[in-house]
Amino acid sequence: MGLSFTKLFSRLFAKKEMRILMVGLDAAGKTTILYKLKLGEIVTTIPTIGFNVETVEYKNISFTVWDVGGQDKIRPLWRHYFQNTQGLIFVVDSNDRDRVVEARDELHRMLNEDELRDAVLLVFANKQDLPNAMNAAEIIDKLGLHSLRQRHWYIQSTCATSGEGLYEGLDWLSNNIASKS
């Protein structure tokens, strides 16, 4: 009896750990999102060559978030981060209409990788504060998200600089990764 109570207690109250990979085209806002979540403030960023990794604590969950540079020359390196990824955050600059097709192509290329077959997908439609930003419905269409029949996905409108939508996205991730394990 004592052992089963201990198991139940630890399941309810032990910190859960989740491995998250955050990718997207360059200048989409990945690093700004990472440090807004980690520090609660806006940091001055430069283009990420390589990666940033931080642990973000939220609601008894420890998210290890890998923010990988998005410049086209380093995108082939993304696959080196796929192993053991439970959740994929794909960040889209909602104001960048010129490169949304490029974003779609990169997203679908990644989702076809065997190592990511079980990862849930959260799309952050970032930069919603800009006047010409595409809304979530438009991003869903442009990224072809409805064609993802076998993939559990969600889109969250965000503004990295204000933090709007970021924690709602983490809530969805934690609920959906937890339900798969």
Curated annotation (Swiss-Prot):
Binding of GTP, residues: 24-31, 67-71, 126-129
EC identifiers of the protein: 3.6.5.2
SUPFAM superfamilies associated with the record: P-loop containing nucleoside triphosphate hydrolases
Gene3D superfamilies, alphabetized: P-loop containing nucleotide triphosphate hydrolases (3.40.50.300)
Record lipid sites (N-myristoyl glycine): 2
Keywords tagged on the record: ER-Golgi transport, Golgi apparatus, GTP-binding, Hydrolase, Lipoprotein, Myristate, Nucleotide-binding, Protein transport, Transport
GO molecular function, one term: GTPase activity
UniProt subcellular location: Golgi apparatus
Top-level EC class: hydrolase
One of the protein's GO biological processes: vesicle-mediated transport
Catalytic activity as recorded in UniProt: GTP + H2O = GDP + phosphate + H(+)
Any one of the GO CC terms: Golgi apparatus
Membership in a protein family: Belongs to the small GTPase superfamily. Arf family.
Protein name: ADP-ribosylation factor 1
